[in-house]
């Protein structure tokens, strides 16, 4: 059959195709006619960006349909989306994509309607109309996907003056959203609010359901003294994370902030300051941790194991890993040992190339398994 492809310059190209052709095939035909490399092409139909591995019939593209061709700015990149079940999805995006576009891609891959998706990055809920670049989301960033439960509820917020405020919320609302609602009602800026429930200070990027806050629960609102400060946390990879904290924060709160930024569960974190391991129930001021102090983060291995990585030169590297480590994590460990950037690494096991977002256990890689490392030539696929 014939279909049409319209470019941004207004030119229309006619292509001979079959319903069973993949989008990849169509891009190759466009390359033959127009000389545009497939990796610079984005095809749009009915407002949706078409994925390479799908067919025309998957998108119900019929004879004489018109596709729109948009040139991919060189800002094409991959990002990861982590669900609460721990599954990681890889998406091809551009810095100029809106959050709405990203949710549509997640719907294509996972079938979750956009209105049930909430995307979180660096502890912030992302708004549909903003772009990835607005939030400084760069290649290989990880977003967190939280499902929006249907059906609202009421909760109460009690202030130190004894006043009680009633709020309409959803279990999937973040603490940040709740603070914004309090600001709407009471005029108190979110950065001066601290919310306490069951004796715990609530972190902005977490949801009410994360804290098991249910209908008619009561939160306590404490005004934040201007004593906020920044501290640094240095990881074994040499990365330094900056955290906004207060001297009265517990070590548990600090670990929760690290989880929000880096996705590392608190029970796998050990924090060291002045040579001492810090205990969850103590506060920063208990340890005399002051502004711009640096803590050291050591990961606690759970049921760790060793695996081997064999290079083409015949060298074998030993790595300490966990079954739950992603291939991305493994490549980072190889980078730490060998200095090879992750984007130049291809890992092979049992004849299969391993995908970044999957875990070792997904591939049934067990202790003392051997992976093979092949270097990706630059500019190669």
UniProtKB/Swiss-Prot annotation:
Cross-link Glycyl lysine isopeptide (Lys-Gly) (interchain with G-Cter in ubiquitin), where in sequence: 48
Domain Ubiquitin-like per the UniProt entry, residue ranges: 1-76, 77-152, 153-228, 229-304, 305-380
Compartment(s) where it occurs, according to its Swiss-Prot or TrEMBL record: Cytoplasm; Nucleus
Protein's recorded name: Polyubiquitin
Propeptide segment residues: 381
Pfam family, one: ubiquitin
Protein family per UniProt: Belongs to the ubiquitin family.
Described function: Ubiquitin exists either covalently attached to another protein, or free (unanchored). When covalently bound, it is conjugated to target proteins via an isopeptide bond either as a monomer (monoubiquitin), a polymer linked via different Lys residues of the ubiquitin (polyubiquitin chains) or a linear polymer linked via the initiator Met of the ubiquitin (linear polyubiquitin chains). Polyubiquitin chains, when attached to a target protein, have different functions depending on the Lys residue of the ubiquitin that is linked: Lys-48-linked is involved in protein degradation via the proteasome.
Site of covalent link Glycyl lysine isopeptide (Gly-Lys) (interchain with K-? in acceptor proteins): 76
PROSITE patterns: UBIQUITIN_1, UBIQUITIN_2
Miscellaneous: Ubiquitin is generally synthesized as a polyubiquitin precursor. Some ubiquitin genes contain a single copy of ubiquitin fused to a ribosomal protein.
Keywords: Cytoplasm, Isopeptide bond, Nucleus, Repeat, Ubl conjugation
One cellular component (GO) term of this entry: nucleus
């Amino acid at each position: 059959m014939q279909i049409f492809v319209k470019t941004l310059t207004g030119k229309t190209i006619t292509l001979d195709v079959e319903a069973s052709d993949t989008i990849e095939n169509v891009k190759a035909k466009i390359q033959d006619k127009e000389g545009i490399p497939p990796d610079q092409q984005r095809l749009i139909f009915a407002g949706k960006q078409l994925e390479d591995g799908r067919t025309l019939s998957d998108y119900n593209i019929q004879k004489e349909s018109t596709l729109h061709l948009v040139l991919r700015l060189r800002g094409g990149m991959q990002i990861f989306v982590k669900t609460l079940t721990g599954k990681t999805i890889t998406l091809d995006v551009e810095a100029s994509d809106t959050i709405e576009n990203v949710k549509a891609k997640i719907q294509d891959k996972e079938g979750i309607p956009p209105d049930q998706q909430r995307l979180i990055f660096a502890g912030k809920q992302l708004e549909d109309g903003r772009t990835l670049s607005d939030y400084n989301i760069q290649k290989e960033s990880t977003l967190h996907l939280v499902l929006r439960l249907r059906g609202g509820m009421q909760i109460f917020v009690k202030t130190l003056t004894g006043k009680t405020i009633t709020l309409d919320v959803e279990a999937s609302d973040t603490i940040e959203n709740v603070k914004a609602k309090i600001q709407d009602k009471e005029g108190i800026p979110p950065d001066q609010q601290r919310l306490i429930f069951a004796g715990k200070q609530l972190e902005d990027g977490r949801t009410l359901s994360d804290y098991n806050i249910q209908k008619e629960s009561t939160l306590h609102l404490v005004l934040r003294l201007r004593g906020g400060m920044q501290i640094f946390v240095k990881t074994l990879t040499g990365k330094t994370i900056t955290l906004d904290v207060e001297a009265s924060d517990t070590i548990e709160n600090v670990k929760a902030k690290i989880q929000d930024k880096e996705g590392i569960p608190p029970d796998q974190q050990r924090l060291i300051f002045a040579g001492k391991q810090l205990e969850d129930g103590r506060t920063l001021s208990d340890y005399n941790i002051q502004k711009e102090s640096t803590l050291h983060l050591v990961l606690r291995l759970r049921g760790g194991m060793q695996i081997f990585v064999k290079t083409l030169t015949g060298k074998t590297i030993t790595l300490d890993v966990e079954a739950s480590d992603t291939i991305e994590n493994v490549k980072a460990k190889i980078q730490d040992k060998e200095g090879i950037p992750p984007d130049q690494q291809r890992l092979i096991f049992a004849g299969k190339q391993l995908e970044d977002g999957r875990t070792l256990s997904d591939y049934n890689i067990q202790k003392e398994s051997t992976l093979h490392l092949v270097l990706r030539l630059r500019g190669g696929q």
